[in-house]
Amino acid sequence: MSEISKNEALILKYLASKNQEIEESNIEIKGLSRQDIASATSWLQVKGLIDVKTREEVAYVLTDEGKRYAENGLPELRAYSILKRKGKLSLRDLQEAMPDEYKIVLAQLAKFGITPKNGVLEYSDGHIEAEISRRQRFLSDLNTDDQEMIEHFKRRKNVIEEKKRSVRIVSINSKGLEQLNNFDQFEAIGEIDSGIITSQAWKTAPFRKYDLDAPVSPTKSYAKHPLVYFINEIRRIFLDMGFTEMSGHYIESALWDMDALFIPQDHPARDMQDTFYVKDSNFTIEHPEIEKRIKRIHERGFDGYSGWGYRWSSDDGKKLILRTHTTVTTARYLYEHNTYPQAIFSVEKVFRHESVDWKHLAEFYQIEGAVYDKNVSVATLKWILRTFYGKLGFEKIRLVPSYYPYTEPSLDVVVEVDGKEMELGGSGIFRPEVGKILGLKAPVMAWGMGLERLAMLYYGLTDVRDLYNTDFSFLEGYKIKY
């Protein structure tokens, strides 16, 4: 037999005395608050000692507009009172007297047959006043039995609002009666406080036993945001592989974001519809000395490489943008640390002028990895891609030839998830022109991917926007993979 608390026993005793079903909200017991009663009845229900039924009820409340009508009178009532007093009322006078409710008045009076003739409303009786007064009374008492008035004001909209509530009906059952008859622990101690200690009641009074199997309310868990957790996991993988983390800037010059990576100045990616440009004249471009090298290689190339053969614009290079990729961070880092070997990575935000939908965002995280070493080749690129994606849990991957303006050869990474293939990122080896611009003495292999698209697979989502929504059920219940 389940143990019950003193409050639960008081509820059972109260229900036994009533010997009938009663609304939980009508239970009144001295010394117990509404919260105490609700808690005790909930536990009695869980223990099977009372029967609980739920009845859905509908009530109506006044909106702000309805409250104004209840206090000041309905528009048609006030207008009809003026009309009754004057006998006639021009539409112009009505509009001046009630400018905000003019149309409402005309619509409601028309239902009683009072319509303007030659721009004038004329008084008419015919029990109109009684009907309008009935409407006014309804706003005062909100009688739910007056279905006609309810339908009338629901059609008018924004006067009354429907509210649904669940009413709990409780009654004691045979198990509860048996429990009550056997209950002899009204003085059992269920909670230690200073009074129990100072009175030394604990020496003689029995203690209520702990029920370790009693059901409890689920505890809400509060942990790191799923994206923060996932970013840390990506960092851990890179660091375990011996990589060094780097960081860059949200705002970059086109010189570094585009030109240093040998992207021509007429490339479609530079268009306003693809890139966010920033208006600012107080921005210092890092390592401006690289400009001469960029200009020469873009225009004329170098031994064995022809360049783009156009007139490179210094003004275009100085334009400021929100970085479109984190490869700009790789380029600058290698320019500043051009001794090999280097293994570097970053997980930072980039910005694209994208239309936001289920798989695209205008602001998102990009995972960037790069290795600078004399032994870099397509074979080592394929090996490190399989190793990296394998640590993310993707065992089946395919590398597909692709094109990127600053790598050659270039490969797309295609993974298999639940029997379906999905492109997850791009990779390649820096073009010789990029290495020449950066002053590198060995090849560089690099790869990158959008973090959010990867997180969608990791957390089983179908819409990338869900990662940024305030859906507490997802934030509290997302599962971590080990």
Curated annotation (Swiss-Prot):
Entry's Gene Ontology cellular component terms: cytoplasm
Enzyme class name: ligase
Binding-site list for Mg(2+): 408
Localization terms from the record: Cytoplasm
Cofactor, free-text remark: Binds 2 magnesium ions per tetramer.
Keyword Isomerase in record: no
InterPro entries: aa-tRNA-synth_II (IPR006195), aa-tRNA-synth_II/BPL/LPL (IPR045864), Phe-tRNA-synth_IIc_asu (IPR004529), Phe_tRNA_ligase_alpha_bac/arc (IPR022917), Phenylalanyl-tRNA_Synthase (IPR002319), WH-like_DNA-bd_sf (IPR036388)
One BP term from GO: phenylalanyl-tRNA aminoacylation
Keyword line: Aminoacyl-tRNA synthetase, ATP-binding, Cytoplasm, Ligase, Magnesium, Metal-binding, Nucleotide-binding, Protein biosynthesis
Catalytic activity from the UniProt record: tRNA(Phe) + L-phenylalanine + ATP = L-phenylalanyl-tRNA(Phe) + AMP + diphosphate + H(+)
Assembly with partners or alone: Tetramer of two alpha and two beta subunits.
Family: Belongs to the class-II aminoacyl-tRNA synthetase family. Phe-tRNA synthetase alpha subunit type 2 subfamily.
NCBIfam families: pheS, PRK04172.1
UniProt-recorded name of the protein: Phenylalanine--tRNA ligase alpha subunit
Lineage: Archaea, Methanobacteriati, Thermoplasmatota, Thermoplasmata, Thermoplasmatales
